[in-house]
Amino acid sequence: MLLAWVRTILVSNMLLAEAYGSGGCFWDNGHLYRADQPSPAPGHSCLNWLDAQSGLAFAPESGAGNHSYCRNPDQDPRGPWCYVSGEAGAPEKRPCQDLRCPDTTSQGLPTSATETEEAAEVPGGDEVFAPANALPARSEAAAVQPVIGISQRVRVNSKEKKDLGTLGYVLGITMMVIIVVIGAGIVLGYTYKRGKDLKAQHEQKVCERELQRITLPLSAFTNPTCEIVDEKTVVVHASQTPVDLQEGSAPLMGQAGTPGA
């Protein structure tokens, strides 16, 4: 099982190298062909893909990129192609040189499968690996190629981001400044209002303490327990008040105590 995984990894790496044009040939109509072939035929040079598409009114979106090499973005059965300058000066499609890889998959697959079975049957001793130059089957190539195509399309789309321009940057900076000013105004307004309220509370407490200090003696005099009560004074004199004597009211005894005196 381990040998099968090792063989699969080696074959996948070889397939990726071939798909990116490291050997100059291509598989499956060259949809993933990436070799630097700038001329479809002697005497002709490929035009830049972006310039050629901008010069055509009904040019499809190829997504080949900003270069002038042979590619096959529309999966043309004839293989990679490019735009060349026609007789009238208009860009026209021209197939590139057919550089298909030799079809050795039918021979390589049984050989590699047999070698894998033989390696699995060896009970011990030296391990036998499949040759590194064995090419994979077309089913394996088809399973790996779509992932590469998606990554290529994502890479092209990331490069085609539009620049906002000077006006966009100015508007963005202006909005940021406005937001910062509004936030600073809110903070300053809250701080000022809070300080004003605290100052008013402090002044009110000072006034209350001053009023208490002024009104304290008056309250002491109005206290019922401290009121002064006026008392009546009785004066006793030493001399007796004279009494008028009337007739018949004289006493029978004098002061000396002698009757009839």
From Swiss-Prot:
InterPro entries named among the record's database cross-references: Kringle (IPR000001), Kringle-like (IPR013806), Kringle_CS (IPR018056), Kringle_sf (IPR038178)
Disulphide linkage map: C25-C101, C46-C82, C70-C96
Keywords (A to Z) from UniProt: Cell membrane, Disulfide bond, Kringle, Membrane, Signal, Transmembrane, Transmembrane helix
GO biological process assignments: negative regulation of phosphatidylinositol 3-kinase/protein kinase B signal transduction
First-listed, main subcellular location of the protein, grouped into a coarse class: membrane
Name assigned to this protein: Phosphoinositide-3-kinase-interacting protein 1
Domain Kringle: 24-101
